[in-house]
Amino acid sequence: SGPGCDRPDRIFLGLIEEIIARLADLLEASGAVLDDTLRQVFSPQSRKRPAALQAALERIGTESDLIARVRLSLLSLERVLTFYSATQQSRAADSGKLKAILKGHQRDLQALQEHTDSMSSRVSLAVDATIGMIGLQQNDTVRVLSVVAALFLPPTLIASTYGMNFQRMPELQWAY
């Protein structure tokens, strides 16, 4: 279904088609990883395991880097196709068919660029959600520490009232 391989132009467009397909596959796989990671972030088990949220944040970072690299590749391919389109020889007998294939590739690139923008937004959501869950865990920890601090408040208050002034402590004159 590709352009064929009987001439250099057709081989070039066939290679471009394959590169675009592989970039689309990378984006699809990255989207699946992001979906899985978000499911794990929002699962009840992740709130009990801080290491799971840290691992999720690392996976999100890795996918973000991959998406950025795919975006850069798409921009480079767009420049290549723009240059090729501007310099294409129209003397070939089937230049109309090649132009149609070229336009199709350019539309595919445009669609994938929009998809990478969407994926970048999803990465942003995933990072925000993960950091929010980490913040909730920290709130739970601070709540426990606040209760413990409140338990030690009365002895601390007594110690701060009397301080180290042993002559003013009435308990020293108590009989045993």
Spell out what each predicted region is.
Residues 107-176:
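Hydrophobic alpha-helical transmembrane segments and their immediately adjacent juxtamembrane loops
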